[in-house]
Swiss-Prot record:
Residues 21-117 form the SH2 domain. Its ability to confer resistance to dietary obesity suggests that it may serve as a possible therapeutic target in cases of type 2 diabetes and obesity. It is an enzyme of class 3 (hydrolase). Tyrosine phosphorylated by the members of the SRC family after exposure to a diverse array of extracellular stimuli such as insulin, growth factors such as EGF or PDGF, chemokines, integrin ligands and hypertonic and oxidative stress. May be phosphorylated upon IgG receptor FCGR2B-binding. Phosphorylated at Tyr-986 following cell attachment and spreading. Phosphorylated at Tyr-1162 following EGF signaling pathway stimulation. Phosphorylated at Thr-958 in response to PDGF. Activated upon translocation to the sites of synthesis of PtdIns(3,4,5)P3 in the membrane. Enzymatic activity is enhanced in the presence of phosphatidylserine. This is Phosphatidylinositol 3,4,5-trisphosphate 5-phosphatase 2. It comes from Homo sapiens (Human). The gene is INPPL1. One of its GO terms (molecular function) is SH3 domain binding. Residues 119-180, 897-1118 are annotated as: Disordered. Widely expressed, most prominently in skeletal muscle, heart and brain. Present in platelets. Expressed in transformed myeloid cells and in primary macrophages, but not in peripheral blood monocytes. The SH2 domain interacts with tyrosine phosphorylated forms of proteins such as SHC1 or FCGR2A. It also mediates the interaction with p130Cas/BCAR1. The NPXY sequence motif found in many tyrosine-phosphorylated proteins is required for the specific binding of the PID domain.
Length: 1258
């Protein structure tokens, strides 16, 4: 928390010196934390108001509650505390006078102002330069920032004297001595001129002499320029300019001061005309010279290079029964003709004959990705008489499968009958260029080639729709850089990309280019910049941003360069918060929301400068072995995100490339980790400084297809980083039925809303609703109920009477399903926001109310939770919709319950659909036409490589450490989780002793903690579930408890009765035993077993960024990650049956459904039986039905196979067997030697051992 003691304020309200109780730019939440730490009645501070510019907020602590009073300036710059009607207003000239009066008792405040609370300052070294680690050792002189750049705002007045202090010394040393001469004139000759004017003089001789003296150097410079231009002019025209010649001849003649000034003005006028004339002369001369030459070629109008036909070698995946009929599995060649819109299936027969079938693009109905087998893909073809057929193919690799899917999507898009696209591809590049010009060839950056997750060679040349290039320490001029980018793209794609925006701040630049066909789809372009150096004004660090609308979808792009230095993590965090708050992008009507909530899709990238907290030799050893997992555990950015300090609920693709900084220039083989400085040797450990993160609205479509770095661009000590994204977009919807009439109006109706807000205040609140589908924002009435079980948190509730009915401007479901609602919870006393959130309308559409549940945040900090019940009523005649192109690819739901390689957990209810590695959970959707018939079925938790057709997601963090504890148990029941909405055990404020709960008794049953983490303090609140989670199995269930055992509420908070409108399976159906620990409330809780994952190299013990799910935080009692863990299971139990846990295996027709919009994961994994796949493929149903019989799913057989392989010491082959379809012991008995070889078993002894063991088990 940073607070400055500068002195903004109207009319010098703070006097000549800012007092200790004044905190500039301090947030409301941070102010309450400072007062809570003070802990004494009468503690107070003054901060800037968040709702009214130029106003202040007086915060007073009394009886452990914070009371806030607004201090408003009037038209005469007097200050007064806002009072109730009828109370006389007292006016003050300064804040000091105001505080002095209210420090006396009985002045109308809740208590007298007794104890001023000072801010916490981060100690800075005397020379506070960002180049502390040698990163910017010789930065070029920064150019002037453009007119669109903005700096941190300062108040209209300053406590310091006039503007002469910081600039005078520099000005005195200016080469022309202008400031010195001017200063001398004002001190001496000014008086003489004044006397002369009083005496009737009509001119100012001393001022004239002063100006002439100051401009003498300008005289000589103009003479030099004129002389050079005259020579250049003679190249194109033999005649000289007589005026120029005369002026040059007079340059050595003696002149008086007045004559000198007249001569200078004349020279400047001649120079202006001469510059214009010489251009015309040159143009005419060159036109005459080329009149006999052949005409210049016309600009190229070629379209993008055509995509050649691509072939993929695959094997047909068949059942065991079919395999016995046809013998060895069949091999196919799939040829994709994007330009022709055809897919050809070529099957090679044993007698060398070929059999092929051609499907046009409109006969390919759906692609179904297997979640469990990464290189398996189901393709649904349309046959005659409206029948379909599904074929499952096994590709050579998962990358080939993704390339095939991308080509088919491109083919569908190219031949679509839709006028506007449903999906576009976006390239994001970030590169710290090290103040060195780039090499001639940067194609590998443009085409995402290099290390990490890269595109397949068949798709690298496909041009993206939008290219965004962010650079730092870029010494190339803006125009030159833009031309370089456009030229590179032109050479690569044969397309003339259009520049949409270019924004610079010093040497930080962001450039956005789009395909020519999309130029008219771009609107509302906005640019901005923020300085984050010393006092947010000096230095060379900061951020630049660009935002625009692509049809109906808003995009934001932020390129930043944060403070360098291993030890400056807190400063980097503050840089991020400053950028988040001060960058002015997007819709101005959404100024109540920070930029993380203003855009459908926000991409944040750049040189974030977060480092690795590990010894340099250990880092180098891990890099040499290409073991990045231990390094990612000590990555500062990951650690800070897991503590909710920065990038709240942003996503980042899994990192599989080496650290991009700090390389020896000219090579990518050596890290230059030591730097000789005057103060000694400076160590710059290799780090992932250059990153790409993103945040999207819930229930939107976004997939990260690549994330890596180049390995052949070596001019800088940073490697360029790239990321490519598949992004769903919406069109500017035009209703075929026209604007909504009263008879067919759509309505957004709320039954209730309930929020938990992190505050020590007890004021009333109201909600504001914003959306592009509304004509204007709407407000609710103040809440009609509130309660508090904890001093630092307040639960507020609104019934339907207090909530408005919203009327969208259009009533069509196709329009409404793409809309979102932004909510901000504001206080009645100061009209300041206590938290904002976004809710997708798609899941709320229906004839019955649906539940929504999400987090509140403010100024980048998590400040609460909000849940409610609402419905979007759409007239029946406006229910028509169509399938989006990105919904054409789905996840095989039959396999969704199987384990994935690295599952992760989400933290909210409504999330963007993303196929990235880090977003965490899949949810199968039902068609919108079915929304009025039945609620959606929730899928089990997982981490798919690609999204389902409608998978709401929130921003999870990456699990990096398998939790330690007891071996995986089964079959023991645990108590159901309690409702955290009324459980004070969840509410812990950072640095403040818990005042309502007894201290936690020691728990001897806690899982052992690694030695490297013994210096950490246990947390007794829910942790944000960062570990791997075992997926539920039919008939088995899964644990509902969090990884940290001390997270369950005490037993005196029973769950409420089950609402009739929201019935679904409880989060824990068949809980499993685990180590018993006690939470703060004293309730016993059984921790879940460690999850299962594919074998990976063993990791040495060490501090883990995921330590929060182990129930630990860093030393120093840093509980910031649990400032708001208050409702990790916010509403799970409110809708859980009160009776005993039921069996996880239910007959299909009786499966219970959750309300749409509730999370599949809210701090812990939910367990549901894997839903049956719903397809129109009749011939496949009979084949798939046995898989769900007998109370087992595919994951169960896989687990048995895993145990069997471990028993015989051959677990290394598990992944190869699973990827080739041998995932169940029941079918392994039919495996052959050839099948084992294809699965990677080459050792004859191992093959014999496997076959013999299987034979004995028959």
């Amino acid at each position: 928390m940073a607070s400055a003691c500068g002195a903004p304020g109207p009319g010098g309200a703070l006097g000549s010196q800012a007092p200790s109780w004044y905190h500039r730019d301090l947030s409301r939440a941070a102010a309450e934390e400072l007062l809570a730490r003070a802990g004494r009645d009468g503690s107070f501070l003054v901060r800037d108001s968040e709702s009214v510019a130029g106003a202040f907020a007086l915060c007073v602590l009394y009886q452990k509650h914070v009371h806030t009073y607004r201090i408003l300036p009037d038209g005469e710059d007097f200050l007064a505390v806002q009072t109730s009607q009828g109370v006389p207003v007292r006016r003050f000239q300064t804040l000091g006078e105001l505080i002095g009066l209210y420090a006396q008792p009985n002045q109308g405040l809740v208590c007298a102002l007794l104890l001023p609370v000072e801010g916490e300052r981060e100690p800075d070294p005397p020379d506070d330069r960002d180049a502390s680690d040698g990163e910017d050792e010789k930065p070029p002189l920064p150019p002037r920032s453009g007119s669109t750049s903005i700096s941190a705002p300062t108040g209209p007045s300053s406590p310091l004297p006039a503007p002469e202090t910081p600039t005078a010394p520099a000005a005195e040393s200016a080469p022309n001595g202008l400031s010195t001469v001017s200063h001398d004139y004002l001190k001496g000759s000014y008086g003489l001129d004044l006397e002369a004017v009083r005496g009737g003089a009509s001119h100012l001789p001393h001022l004239t002499r002063t100006l002439a003296t100051s401009c003498r150097r300008l005289h000589s410079e103009v003479d030099k320029v004129l002389s050079g231009l005259e020579i250049l002019s003679k190249v194109f025209d033999q005649q000289s300019s007589p005026m120029v010649t005369r002026l040059l001849q007079q340059q050595n003649l003696p002149q008086t001061g007045e004559q000198e000034l007249e001569s200078l003005v004349l020279k400047l006028s001649v120079l202006k005309d001469f510059l214009s004339g010489i251009q015309k002369k040159a143009l005419k001369a060159l036109q005459d010279m080329s009149s006999t030459a052949p005409p210049a070629p016309q600009p190229s109008t070629r379209k993008a290079k055509t995509i050649p036909v691509q072939a993929f070698e695959v094997k047909l995946d068949v059942t065991l029964g079919d395999l016995t009929k046809i013998g060895k599995s069949q091999k196919f060649t799939l040829s994709v003709d994007v330009e022709g819109g055809r897919l050809v299936l070529l099957r090679r027969q044993r007698d060398s004959q070929e059999d092929w079938t051609t499907f046009t693009h409109d006969r390919i109905r759906q692609l179904i990705k297997s979640q469990r087998v990464q290189n398996k893909l189901g393709v649904v073809f349309e046959k005659e008489k409206d029948r379909t057929q599904r074929k499952d193919f096994i590709f050579v690799s998962a990358r080939k499968r993704e390339a095939f899917c991308q080509l088919l999507q491109l083919m569908k898009n190219k031949h679509s009958k839709q006028d506007e696209p449903d999906m576009i591809s976006v390239f994001i590049g970030t590169w710290n260029m090290g103040s060195v010009p780039p090499p001639k060839n940067v194609t590998s950056w443009f085409t995402s080639k290099g290390l990490g997750k890269t595109l397949d060679e068949v798709t690298v040349t496909i041009p993206h729709d939008i290219y965004v290039f962010g650079t730092q320490e870029n010494s190339v001029g803006d125009r030159e850089w833009l031309d370089l980018l456009r030229g590179g793209l032109k050479e690569l794609t044969d397309l003339d990309y259009r520049p949409i925006a270019m924004q610079s701040l010093w040497n930080i630049k962001v450039a956005v280019l789009v395909k020519p066909e999309h130029e008219n789809r771009i609107s509302h372009v906005s640019t901005s910049s923020v300085k984050t150096g010393i006092a947010n004004t000096l230095g060379n660090k900061g951020a630049v941003g660009v935002s625009f609308m692509f049809n109906g979808t808003s995009f934001g792009f932020v390129n930043c360069h944060l403070t360098s230095g291993n030890e400056k993590t807190a400063r980097r965090n503050q840089n991020y918060l400053d950028i988040l708050r001060l960058l002015s992008l997007g819709d101005r009507q959404l100024n109540a929301f920070d930029i993380s909530l203003r855009f459908t899709h926000l991409f944040w990238f750049g040189d974030l400068n977060y480092r690795l907290d590990m010894d340099i030799q250990e880092i180098l050893n891990y890099i040499s072995r290409k073991e990045f997992e231990p390094l990612l555990r000590v990555d500062q950015l990951n650690l800070e995100r897991e503590k909710h300090k920065v990038f709240l609920r942003f996503s980042e693709e899994e990192i599989s490339f080496p650290p991009t900084y700090r390389y020896e220039r000219g090579s990518r083989d050596t890290y230059a980790w030591h730097k000789q400085k005057p103060t000694g040797v400076r160590t710059n450990v290799p780090s992932w400084c250059d990153r790409i993160l993103w945040k999207s609205y819930p229930e939107t479509h976004i997939i990260c297809n690549s994330y890596g770095c180049t390995d052949d661009i070596v001019t800088s000590d940073h490697s360029p980083v790239f990321g490519t994204f598949e992004v769903g977009v919406t069109s500017q919807f035009i209703s075929k039925k026209g604007l909504s009439k009263t008879s067919d109006q759509a309505y957004i109706e709320f039954e209730s809303i309930e929020a938990i807000v992190k505050t020590a205040s007890r004021t009333k609140f109201f909600i504001e609703f914003y959306s592009t589908c509304l004509e204007e924002y709407k407000k609710s009435f103040e809440n009609d109920a509130q309660s508090s079980d904890n001093i630092n948190f307040l639960k507020v509730q609104w019934s339907s009477r207090q909530l408005p009915t919203l009327k969208p401007i259009l009533a069509d479901i196709e329009y409404l399903q793409d809309q979102h609602l932004l909510l901000t919870v504001k206080s009645m006393d100061g009209y300041e926001s206590y938290g904002e959130c976004v809710v997708a309308l798609k899941s709320m559409i229906g004839s019955t109310a649906q539940q929504f549940l999400t987090f509140l945040s403010h100024r980048g900090e998590e400040t609460g939770n909000i849940r409610g019940s609402m419905k979007v009523r759409v007239p029946t005649e406006r229910l028509g919709t169509r399938e989006r192109l990105y919904e054409w690819i789905s996840i095989d739901k039959d396999e969704a319950g199987a384990k994935s390689k690295a599952p992760s957990v989400s933290r909210g209810s409504q999330e963007p659909r993303s196929g990235s590695r880090k977003p965490a959970f899949t949810e199968a959707s039902c068609p919108l036409s079915r929304l009025f018939e039945e609620p959606e079925k929730p899928p089990p938790t997982g981490r798919p490589p690609a999204p389902p057709r409608a998978a709401p997601r929130e921003e999870p963090l990456t699990p990096r450490l398998k939790p330690e504890g007891a071996p995986e148990p089964e079959g023991v029941a645990a108590p159901p989780p309690k409702n955290s909405f009324n459980n004070p055990a969840y509410y812990v404020l950072e640095g403040v002793p818990h005042q309502l709960l007894p201290p936690e008794p020691p728990s001897p049953a806690r899982a052992p903690v690694p030695s490297a983490t013994k210096n950490k303090v246990a947390i007794t609140v829910p942790a944000p579930q960062l570990g791997h989670h075992r997926h539920p199995r039919v008939g088995e269930g899964s644990s509902s408890d969090e990884e940290s055992g001390g997270t369950l509420p005490p037993p005196d908070f029973p769950p409420p009765p089950l609402p009739d409108s929201a019935i679904f399976l409880p989060p824990s159906l068949d809980p499993l035993p685990g180590p018993v620990v006690r939470g703060r409330g004293g309730a016993e809780a059984r921790g879940p077993p460690p999850p299962k994952a594919h074998p990976r190299p063993p990791l040495p013990p060490g501090p883990s960024p995921a330590s929060t799910f182990l129930g630990e935080v860093a030393s120093g009692d840093d509980r910031s990650c649990s400032v708001l863990q208050m409702a990790k299971t916010l509403s799970e139990v409110d809708y859980a049956p009160a009776g005993p846990a039921r069996s996880a295996l239910l007959p299909g027709p009786l499966e219970l459904q959750p309300p749409r919009g509730l999370p599949s994961d809210y701090g812990r994994p939910l367990s549901f039986p894997p839903p049956r796949i719903r397809e129109s493929i009749q011939e496949d149903l009979a084949e798939e039905a046995p898989c769900l019989q007998g109370g087992r799913a595919s994951g169960l057989g896989e687990a048995g196979m895993s145990a069997w392989l471990r028993a015989i010491g051959l677990e290394r082959y598990e992944e190869g067997l699973v990827h080739n379809g041998w995932d169940d012991l029941e079918f392994l008995s039919d495996i052959t030697e050839e099948d084992l070889e294809e699965a990677g078993v080459q050792d004859p002894a191992h093959k014999r051992l496997l076959l013999d063991t299987l034979q004995l088990s028959k």
